[in-house]
Amino acid sequence: MGSAQDQTKKRKRQKVSDGSKSSKSRVVEADDQRELTETTTKPKKQKTEDPPTDETPDAEDVEQTENGETAQDDAAKDAEAPLPSTMGLSLPTDAAPQKFDELNLSEPTMKAIRQMGFETMTEIQQRTIPPTLAGRDILGAAKTGSGKTLAFLIPAVEMLSALRFKPRNGTGVIIITPTRELALQIFGVAKELCEFHSQTYGIVIGGANRRAEAEKLNKGVNLLIATPGRLLDHLQNTQGFVYKNCKVLVLDEADRCLDVGFEAELRQIVKILPSEERQTLLFSATQTTKVEDLARISLKPGPLYINVDHRKEHATVDGVDQGYIICEADKRFLLLFTFLKKNLKKKIIIFFSSCNAVKYYADLLNYIDLPVLALHGKLKQQTRTQRFFEFCNATQGTLICTDVAARGLDIPAVDYIIQFDPPDEPKAYIHRVGRTARGTKGKIGRSIMLLQPSEVGFLNVLREARVPVVEFEFPQKKIIDIQSQLEKLIGQNYYLNQIQSAKDGYRAYLHAYASHSLRSVFNINKLDLVKVAKSFGFTTPPRVDITLGASMSKDKVQARRPYGSQNKSARFKRRA
């Protein structure tokens, strides 16, 4: 930064107006401003595919420009325009601001923030937004539910506005997230934040119509939210995708991206995107060796490390009562049924360990007049999206799901998290619990984990991970005993027994248990299979095969194990 006199001279030489009052103007260096204005030399056009002329852009994916022109009209006028370096931007870096209006943000952004109902920043927002506005690369560690979505979206939108991005400039911000639901969640927040800006925004995710996505990218999407696989596909194969002007790359939930197998895709994406003037923000709830390696190849040397958790006594978010109930396997479903019956007016999320268990229990609960929504990875994307937003908008109801919904999603006003099946590790527990009381002061959520007597060793694992849990009592005499009716229903109902197979759910539960990462605690040989089978509505355990293959951890050898109705001495012998 120069002296006040130098700054005055620069302002006299060049000023970039954003259409608002002159006091709100953004200042850039003179050389950069000359690049921003349209040059007399016509830039080389990038080869594109002509989108169908009869298709109108989706209002939610591609917004209109300030002058009422659509992104398609704007893109047709010219090829992508060169943009200045972000290094010339003079953005506010006031020390330790507490409220959004102390950041000197543009009026369209402030108007959107006020409309969203926010006034005071969370800690991650206080510590991240000012240095990000100043152009620093960020390596952030924050709990789920801490408010980091706005922490990276606000600077991203401000940058696009300050540089006056047009659709013809292509994509200036790319946000990568591990799951489709989280991408949709971020897209919803971006839509609200961009309401009073002229910049366009969009989303590309697996399971959606790829051709429609490509057409929107051809028209120009300034802010793009994406899942790694689909983004890499467009980077490599969509010729009209203008990404050379990408100024900001956000890697959200980076540890989760790596956990679910996107390491190779992320490395290729980072390599393809321009790096010289790119600002990168990497957020991860946990810091692992793989996350550090990804940070090394994506961030500039000397990034700002922001950790809002290290001073916290507990690893989970505040405002959540966390506890567990010791329950025999054959009482688990009866306890769940009783709990749901007594809390029909509450908003509840229940976690299971497998898709087949979710499918079975969803059909069972709906059949016995306990309405629930099911969310798991085997659903079509349109169905997943519809159910996710249906539950988000509901004031009461029950969602049963796998961990596909456990990471990063902001589901409003959840009263209870029920972990029907224990998580695979403390990290998964933390993200499940993060679905309730997300960044809201005064909101108390409750998390309840069901543990069998043989699983109490998991409590020591949680305590070592700084997760506070207490034992909740649920009197046995209050449990509604419908076991005989349940067994009769499963025995006689063809749909539940064969079509939505209780047997498939039972097999999937045993498979997940056998492949648990904490096998010293969750030992399948300690399970009482008769009691486990009763929780699925069987009078005797059905015979099922469990395949443990190479996709699991190294200490698991390939084997095929039969479980079910056989004599006790032979029950756990491997088949030759």
From Swiss-Prot:
Q: Give the main EC class.
A: hydrolase
Alphabetized SUPFAM superfamilies for the sequence: P-loop containing nucleoside triphosphate hydrolases (SSF52540)
| Coiled-coil residue spans | none
Sorted alphabetically, which CDD domains does this protein's record hold? DEADc_DDX18 (cd17942), SF2_C_DEAD (cd18787)
List the Gene Ontology MF annotations in alphabetical order. Answer: ATP binding; ATP hydrolysis activity; identical protein binding; RNA binding; RNA helicase activity
**Keyword tags:** ATP-binding, Helicase, Hydrolase, Nucleotide-binding, Nucleus, Ribosome biogenesis, RNA-binding, rRNA processing
Q: Does the keyword RNA-binding apply?
A: yes
E.C. number(s) listed in UniProt: 3.6.4.13
> Residue ranges for motif DEAD box?
252-255
* Pfam families, per database record: CTE_SPB4, DEAD, Helicase_C
UniProt feature, compositional bias: Acidic residues? 51-66
Q: Which reaction does it catalyse?
A: ATP + H2O = ADP + phosphate + H(+)
Residues reported in the UniProt entry to bind ATP? A142, K143, T144, G145, S146, G147, K148, T149
Q: Where is the composition biased (Basic and acidic residues)?
A: 26-37
**What biological process terms from GO does the record include?**
maturation of LSU-rRNA from tricistronic rRNA transcript (SSU-rRNA, 5.8S rRNA, LSU-rRNA); maturation of SSU-rRNA from tricistronic rRNA transcript (SSU-rRNA, 5.8S rRNA, LSU-rRNA); snoRNA release from pre-rRNA
Q: What function is annotated for this protein? A: ATP-dependent RNA helicase involved in 40S ribosomal subunit biogenesis. Required for the processing and cleavage of 35S pre-rRNA at sites A0, A1, and A2, leading to mature 18S rRNA.
Protein name, as recorded: ATP-dependent RNA helicase has1
Originating organism: Aspergillus terreus (strain NIH 2624 / FGSC A1156)
